[in-house]
């Protein structure tokens, strides 16, 4: 009897495993950045069995001091995506997690914006998006593309959605770094890339973008579905609430969720389980 139970459990495990998606590691050669850029990519169950299937795509951006592996390892992306797709909360999709930094912050480029010596936004839209979408049979239009991220990646995804509203159906910003005071001074005697990314976040302020938006820009922003998600004890709380209020004044609809939590993975583990269904509901 016990042997039969073990056999049944093993069979069920094999069945579940066979239905699982996969997270792959890949890279793209960037002429813009002059280097290879790595990324992780989640592909759903059935991706290899049906070579003609096309999928919507989510660009999932990591935070400051992390890299392309953060959502795979700390965020448990394969488990989360498999569960949400299995329950029908999310549609089968391709999830791209590109590298935009690393833990050695003073000597490693971090950030999603163009800076002197680091034209990441140009790389993202001119090289990464077209190559990844062709290779993984994904995206291809506004209605089949979403962007989201946490902290630095939350700010990056927000600004990408603002400046490229014609390319994304939805934006989900988690604990987003949306602006800085611009007051940090460069550390003398070192190649201070922390100063550069802080300066770039201020120069590319998501808050200023809404403040200065003219009628045509507001119309474009209204074509995107927005979700702002931040913990009540997060040090970026005020910036996230301010963005929501600015958007309300311009009558740009956005969802706002303030939940109990801080700027950490405990919070983002819950956020991603809302983010992927949100993107799924807004694909078209």
List the model feature ranges, each with a label:
Residues 1, 20-21:
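Absolute protein N-terminus
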């Amino acid at each position: 009897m016990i042997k039969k139970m073990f056999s049944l459990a093993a069979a069920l495990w094999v069945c579940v495993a066979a239905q699982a998606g996969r997270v792959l590691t890949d890279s793209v050669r960037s002429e813009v950045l002059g280097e290879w850029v790595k990324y992780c990519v989640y592909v759903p169950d059935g991706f290899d069995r049906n070579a003609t299937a096309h999928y919507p795509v989510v660009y999932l951006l990591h935070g400051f001091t992390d890299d392309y592996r953060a959502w795979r390892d700390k965020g448990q992306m394969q488990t989360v995506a498999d569960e949400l797709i299995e329950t029908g909360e999310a549609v089968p999709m391709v999830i791209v997690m590109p590298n935009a930094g690393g833990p050695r912050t003073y000597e490693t480029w971090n950030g999603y914006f163009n800076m002197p010596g680091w034209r990441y936004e140009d790389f993202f839209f001119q090289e990464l998006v077209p190559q990844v979408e062709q290779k993984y049979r994904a995206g291809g239009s506004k209605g089949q593309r979403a962007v989201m991220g946490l902290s630095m990646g939350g700010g990056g995804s927000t600004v990408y959605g603002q400046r490229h509203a014609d390319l994304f159906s939805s934006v989900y910003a988690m604990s987003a770094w949306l602006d800085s005071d611009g007051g940090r001074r460069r550390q003398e005697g070192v190649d201070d890339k922390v100063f550069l990314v802080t300066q770039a976040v201020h120069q590319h302020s998501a808050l200023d973008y809404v403040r200065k938006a003219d009628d045509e820009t507001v119309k474009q922003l209204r074509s995107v579905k927005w979700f702002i998600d931040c913990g009540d004890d997060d040090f970026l709380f005020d910036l996230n609430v301010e963005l929501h209020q600015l958007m309300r004044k311009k009558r740009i609809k956005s969802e706002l969720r303030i939940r109990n939590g801080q700027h950490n993975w405990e919070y983002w583990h819950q956020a991603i389980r809302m983010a992927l269904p949100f993107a799924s509901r807004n694909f078209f």
